[in-house]
C-alpha cells in the first residue's frame, strides 16, 4: 500500500495550502498566498508568493512576517498591497494594517493603520488610488476619537454592546459596537459617515480612474430583516447615490468594467415558504439613467463569482455545474453563455488579464487548490507552486435514480485495496451547495486512507443542477433530500469495492441535520456522526445568527414537519455529536438538546450507570467548522475511532490529549 500524507494526520496538516490570487493590471505578475503550520502546530501562517505567469519558473516567496500576510491586491503601478499583523515595541497585539510592497523592490511599508484594523482593500486599475474597509465606533467622530474610545473600553475591561437592530452576531463573532466604513487610503478620508449596518458583509469595487466606488449597501426591511442595494459613492465628496434597488431581492457582488463604462452584479430573489430564491446575473451601463437588466435569464445556473474580461467585452463568471465549477463567459448584451473550461475541476479566484488570458485557482477531489493559466484557445497550464499530494485511493462518479426519476450524482472515493470497503455516506452542508471542490476541513481522503469508501452525493437542494432540483427539496428537507441520499447510498452499496453490510452516515451543518434526520428514519447504518447539526428547527430558526433569512422558508408548519427532534424515540444507532461553542450559525443549543434527548428519550438511552453508546465531542473555543490544526486532528481521531468501534467492531482509540 502506498504511503501518503493522508495516512498520517500530522503529515496531512503539514501540506502547504494555497488560497487567493491577484494579477497586476498588465498581466505580468501573479501573486498567491500559501499557508503553513507554525512551529507550535497550533496555527496556520500565510505568506505571499509570486508565481511565474509563463508556468516555467518555481514560485518565489515575497513576505516572511511572523504573523503572516494575506489578501494581496495590485495597484495600478504594480505595487502589491496586503494585510498584515506586525507587532511593535508599543503594541504586541495590533490589529491588521494595510501594507505596500513596491514593485521596484525594497522593504514593505505600512500604508494604513487604524485602531480597529483594516478588513480589505481595493485599488483602482488606472490610478494610484485605494479604498479600504475598516471599522469605527459609532460615537467616534474621527479616527483619533475612535482610538481614544477603544482604549477606554480596553482599560476599563468593557466589552458590553448595546444593540438597536439586527443581526447581533455573525458566524463566530459578535457584531458591534463598531461599524464597517470605507476609507480613501491616500487621502485618509472616511467616505461613509454613520453607515450603521449598511456595510456588514459588503463587497465593493473602485472605478478604474478612482473617482467613485460602487458598494453593496444593506438597508432595513420589515421586522428584523434587511436587504442589499447598490450605491455609488463619489470618492472626492463622499456623496452617496443608490443606483440599484429591488425590494424583492438582494443585489450584491458589484464589479466595475475595466473601462469604467458599466457595472455587473448578482441579484438573489428573496425566497418564500414555497419557492427558493434564484441568483441571476445583472448588468447596467452608467450612462443608462440607472436602468439595469438581468442577463442570461434562461440559463439555469447560479453565478457564484463575477468579473470582467480585461477588454470589458464579456463577463467572466463561475457557477456550480453537475459536480464541477467551470468558468463561463457571458455576453452582457445578448446573454449568450459560453463554457470556457471542460474538466472535473472547480475554479475560483478568477483573474482575467490582457490578451484574453485568465488566471485562477482550481481544485477537485483529485487535487487541492492550485494556480493555473487559461489561454484563449482553451489550454490550461499549471503554474509551479506546491506539489499535489499523492492520493490514497481512487475517485469515481456514480449516478442513482431518485424516487421521482431524477438523476442524483455523487463522487465516491475508494481505498487502494480491491477488498470491499465499509462505506461512509458524507452529506454536504449548505444546504445550497455541492461536493465539487477540494475541502481541507471536510476531506474524504483521510477516511479513505483509513480503509473507508466515502460517498459524497448531491441530493435535492444542491446547486449546479438547475432551479427545479433545488425546488424539489425546498421546505421539505426530510423528504426528497433524504430519499435522494438513500438512493445514492443504494447505488454505492452496489459497487463491487463497497461492503454494503458495514456502513455509516455523517455530515456537518445541513449535513448534520440530515445525519440527525437519518438517525430517526432508518436503522441501516452502524454509526452516525453529526457535526454542528440542526436538531430542533423551531429553536434554530429563532436563535441562528441570520434568523430573518431562514424564517422565509422555515414557517411553523415547515419546522414541525421537518424537525428531527420529533423522531428521537426511533434512534437506535450510536451517534457521535460534535459542536463548537462559538458556532453562531447553528448555535450550541442544538447539540445540547440533542445530547440530552439521546440520553433520555432515544431507543439507546443512558443506562442506570449513565452510560450509552453515544458520544459528545465538545469544543469550547471552536466555531462552526472547528478550524485550528490541533482540534482538526482530534476531530478526525475521534471520528475514525467512533466509526471503527461501531462499523468495524474495533476497540475505540480515544486521543490521549482529551484527558
Please tell me what each predicted stretch does.
Residues 15-30, 66-81, 108, 113-129, ...:
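Conserved beta-propeller blade repeats
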Residues 79-142:
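Hydrophobic or amphipathic alpha-helical targeting/insertion segments
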Amino acid at each position: 500500500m502506498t504511503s501518503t500524507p493522508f495516512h498520517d494526520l500530522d503529515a496531512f496538516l503539514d501540506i502547504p495550502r494555497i488560497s487567493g490570487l491577484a494579477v497586476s493590471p498588465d498581466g505580468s505578475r501573479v501573486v498567491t498566498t500559501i499557508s503553513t503550520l507554525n512551529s507550535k502546530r497550533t496555527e496556520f501562517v500565510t505568506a505571499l508568493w509570486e508565481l511565474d505567469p509563463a508556468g516555467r519558473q518555481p514560485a518565489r516567496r515575497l513576505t516572511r512576517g511572523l504573523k503572516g500576510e494575506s489578501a494581496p491586491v495590485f495597484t495600478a503601478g504594480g505595487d502589491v498591497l496586503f494585510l498584515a499583523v506586525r507587532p511593535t515595541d508599543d503594541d504586541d497585539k495590533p490589529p491588521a494594517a494595510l501594507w505596500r510592497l513596491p514593485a521596484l523592490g525594497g522593504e514593505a511599508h505600512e500604508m494604513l493603520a487604524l485602531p480597529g484594523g483594516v478588513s480589505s482593500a481595493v485599488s483602482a486599475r488606472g490610478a494610484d488610488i485605494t479604498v479600504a474597509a475598516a471599522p469605527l465606533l459609532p460615537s467616534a467622530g474621527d479616527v483619533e476619537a475612535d482610538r481614544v474610545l477603544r482604549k477606554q473600553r480596553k482599560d476599563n475591561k468593557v466589552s458590553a454592546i448595546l444593540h438597536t437592530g439586527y443581526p447581533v452576531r455573525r458566524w463566530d463573532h459578535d457584531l458591534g459596537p463598531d461599524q464597517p466604513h470605507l476609507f480613501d487610503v491616500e487621502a485618509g478620508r472616511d467616505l461613509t459617515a454613520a453607515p450603521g449596518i449598511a456595510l456588514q458583509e459588503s463587497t465593493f469595487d473602485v472605478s478604474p480612474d478612482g473617482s467613485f466606488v460602487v458598494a453593496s449597501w444593506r438597508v432595513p426591511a420589515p421586522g428584523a430583516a434587511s436587504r442589499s442595494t447598490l450605491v455609488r459613492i463619489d470618492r472626492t465628496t463622499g456623496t452617496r447615490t443608490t443606483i440599484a434597488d429591488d425590494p424583492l431581492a438582494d443585489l450584491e457582488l458589484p464589479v466595475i468594467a475595466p473601462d469604467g463604462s458599466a457595472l455587473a452584479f448578482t441579484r438573489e430573489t428573496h425566497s418564500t415558504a414555497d419557492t427558493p430564491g434564484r441568483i441571476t446575473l445583472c448588468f447596467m451601463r452608467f450612462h443608462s439613467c440607472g436602468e439595469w437588466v438581468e442577463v442570461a435569464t434562461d440559463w439555469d445556473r447560479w453565478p457564484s463569482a463575477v468579473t470582467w474580461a480585461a477588454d470589458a467585452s464579456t463577463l467572466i463568471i463561475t457557477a456550480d455545474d453537475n459536480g464541477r465549477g467551470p468558468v463561463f463567459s457571458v455576453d452582457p448584451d445578448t446573454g449568450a453563455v459560453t463554457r470556457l473550461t471542460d474538466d472535473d475541476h472547480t475554479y475560483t479566484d478568477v483573474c482575467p488579464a490582457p490578451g484574453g488570458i485568465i488566471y485562477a485557482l482550481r481544485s477537485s477531489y483529485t487535487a487541492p487548490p492550485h494556480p493555473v493559466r487559461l489561454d484563449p484557445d482553451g489550454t490550461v497550464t499549471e503554474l509551479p507552486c506546491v506539489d499535489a499530494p499523492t492520493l490514497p485511493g481512487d475517485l469515481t462518479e456514480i449516478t442513482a435514480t431518485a424516487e421521482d426519476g431524477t438523476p442524483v450524482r455523487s463522487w465516491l472515493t475508494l481505498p487502494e485495496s480491491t477488498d470491499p470497503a465499509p462505506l461512509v455516506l458524507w452529506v454536504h452542508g449548505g444546504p445550497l451547495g455541492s461536493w465539487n471542490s477540494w475541502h481541507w476541513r471536510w476531506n474524504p481522503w483521510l477516511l479513505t486512507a483509513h480503509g473507508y469508501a466515502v460517498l459524497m452525493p448531491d441530493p435535492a437542494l444542491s446547486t449546479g443542477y438547475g432551479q427545479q432540483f433545488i425546488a424539489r427539496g425546498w421546505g421539505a428537507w426530510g423528504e426528497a433530500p433524504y430519499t435522494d441520499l438513500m438512493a445514492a447510498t443504494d447505488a454505492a452499496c452496489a459497487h463491487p469495492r463497497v461492503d454494503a453490510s458495514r456502513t455509516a452516515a455523517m455530515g456537518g451543518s445541513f449535513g448534520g441535520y440530515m445525519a440527525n434526520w437519518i438517525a430517526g428514519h432508518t436503522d441501516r447504518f452502524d454509526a452516525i456522526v453529526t457535526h454542528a447539526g440542526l436538531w430542533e428547527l423551531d429553536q434554530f430558526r429563532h436563535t441562528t445568527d441570520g434568523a430573518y433569512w431562514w424564517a422565509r422558508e422555515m414557517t411553523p408548519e415547515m419546522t414541525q414537519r421537518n424537525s428531527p427532534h420529533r423522531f428521537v424515540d426511533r434512534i437506535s444507532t450510536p451517534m457521535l455529536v460534535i459542536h463548537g461553542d462559538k458556532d453562531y450559525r447553528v448555535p450550541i443549543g442544538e447539540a445540547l438538546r440533542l445530547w440530552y434527548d439521546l440520553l433520555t428519550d432515544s431507543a439507546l438511552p443512558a443506562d442506570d450507570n449513565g452510560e450509552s453508546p453515544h458520544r459528545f465531542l465538545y469544543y469550547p473555543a471552536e466555531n462552526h467548522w472547528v478550524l485550528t490544526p490541533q482540534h482538526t486532528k482530534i476531530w478526525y481521531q475521534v471520528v475514525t475511532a467512533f466509526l471503527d468501534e461501531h462499523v468495524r467492531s474495533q476497540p475505540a482509540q480515544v486521543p490521549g490529549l482529551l484527558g
